[in-house]
Swiss-Prot record:
SUPFAM superfamilies: EF-Tu/eEF-1alpha/eIF2-gamma C-terminal domain, P-loop containing nucleoside triphosphate hydrolases, Translation proteins. The lineage of its organism: Bacteria, Bacillati, Bacillota, Bacilli, Lactobacillales. GTP hydrolase that promotes the GTP-dependent binding of aminoacyl-tRNA to the A-site of ribosomes during protein biosynthesis. Belongs to the TRAFAC class translation factor GTPase superfamily. Classic translation factor GTPase family. EF-Tu/EF-1A subfamily. Its EC number is 3.6.5.3. PROSITE patterns: G_TR_1 (PS00301), G_TR_2 (PS51722). This is Elongation factor Tu. It comes from the Bacteria. GO terms for molecular function: GTP binding; GTPase activity; translation elongation factor activity. Its main location: cytoplasm. Residues 82-85 are annotated as: G3.
Length: 396
């Protein structure tokens, strides 16, 4: 059995992805980046067909094809997401399967911005992708430089329309295909693109630096010691002596102090984002904490019942509904670790939502849940997933 390579944390890690209209060159650019960086000893070259034949992944009950490639620049380690089909992009961005810190928007100079260009920018804005770098592709196929200037202006205007700093966004012009074919001038353009990404997209705050949050999956009692809540730490860190709040499913917030921490039946000094832990809570009875609540750093998250969500609705081939739904539809919303019934109100002008649609609507839950902008959820009906989304705005 070959030994697994150890992941060395020497450079800061950033998640990015390519977005843009079909056939504008997203996958070609992804291949070009790995090829050029491989020449510089910073990546393994991935060819177009490897990236395009993306494996299927299940994310919260939804099948998505996504290609993940990794590479390094002089300063950073990147995980780069590329998805073959338009529907895969939508699902990827909405379900948060690929949490992007920044994106490279690919626009073909031959076409200019197209419908999916707009849709991807809107989605990037909705799901909190704060930084976009533009790659104007296929510039070798446009004879008139003024046309390229025009396309750049259109892209900048479109970004401004969706609250990105259109005037300041970096725009790199080149030909991904030529770079992939080994044209030295275009390979330098790819290097310049990656230097720009390095500089323009800031290193994200690490999950461990954020306030502590752990969705409760299970609760049990240790005789003589008290109540233990277990789950996977979503963000932040926790140690013995920390004060925590138990939030959700009721308007009352219980306060407690962590008196013990264990992982894999061993005591633990510090639990951090990603760890599955059991947290022993001082002065809390078995009935004061339940699955579906969260343990959180005091004051860091509140309960809400009403919110707007950006949602992808599964089509019937994906195991979703066979029929549309209307306002007042009442499915279960699965947040953190539990289902809560909610009533959907569609936006004005939207009569109904068809399977396969991507839509923003308002939800009113029957119980308060610990949520904030960016919280992920799935929509379920009779135990099967019919949609997935995330909170875009809190309304109460």
């Amino acid at each position: 059995m070959a030994e697994k390579e150890h992941y060395e944390r020497t450079k800061p890690h950033v998640n990015i992805g390519t977005i843009g209209h079909v056939d504008h060159g997203k996958t070609t650019l992804t291949a070009a980046i790995t090829t050029v960086l491989a020449e510089d000893g910073l990546a393994q070259a991935e060819d177009y067909s490897q990236i395009d034949a993306a494996p299927e992944e299940k994310e919260r009950g939804i099948t998505i094809n996504t290609a993940h490639v990794e590479y390094e620049t002089k300063n950073r380690h990147y995980a780069h997401m590329d998805a073959p089909g338009h529907a895969d992009y939508i699902k990827n961005m909405i379900t948060g399967a690929a949490q992007m810190d920044g994106a490279i928007l690919v626009v073909a100079a031959t076409d200019g911005p197209m419908p999916q260009t707009r849709e991807h920018i809107l989605l990037a804005r909705q799901v909190g992708v704060k930084y976009i770098v533009v790659f104007l592709n296929k510039v070798d196929l446009v004879d008139d430089p003024e046309l390229i200037d025009l396309v750049e202006m259109e892209v900048r205007d479109l970004l401004t329309e969706y609250d990105y700093p259109g005037d300041d966004v970096p725009v790199i012009r080149g030909s991904a295909l030529k770079a992939l074919q080994g044209d030295p001038e275009q390979q330098d353009v790819i290097r310049k693109l990656m230097e720009t990404v390095d500089e323009y997209i800031p290193t994200p705050e690490r999950d461990t630096d954020k306030p502590f949050l752990m969705p409760v999956e299970d609760v049990f009692t240790i005789t003589g010691r008290g109540t233990v809540a277990s789950g996977r730490i979503d963000r932040g860190t926790v140690k013995v002596g920390d004060e925590v709040e138990i939030v959700g499913l009721t308007d009352k917030v219980e306060k407690s102090t962590v008196t013990g921490l264990e992982m894999f039946h061993k005591t633990l000094d510090l639990g951090e984002a990603g760890d599955n832990v059991g947290v022993l809570l001082r002065g809390i009875d078995r009935d004061q904490v339940e699955r579906g609540q969260v343990l959180a750093a005091p004051g860091s998250i509140q309960t809400h019942k009403k919110f707007k969500g950006q949602v992808y609705i599964l089509n019937k081939d994906e195991g979703g509904r066979h029929t549309p739904f209307f306002s007042d539809y009442r499915p279960q919303f699965y947040f953190h670790t539990t289902d809560v019934t909610g009533k959907i109100e569609l936006p004005e002008g939207t009569e109904m939502v068809m399977p396969g649609d991507n839509v923003e609507f308002t939800v009113e839950l029957i119980k308060p849940v610990a949520i904030e902008k960016g919280t992920k959820f799935t929509i379920r009906e009779g135990g099967k997933t019919v949609g997935a989304g995330q909170v875009t705005e809190i309304l109460d």
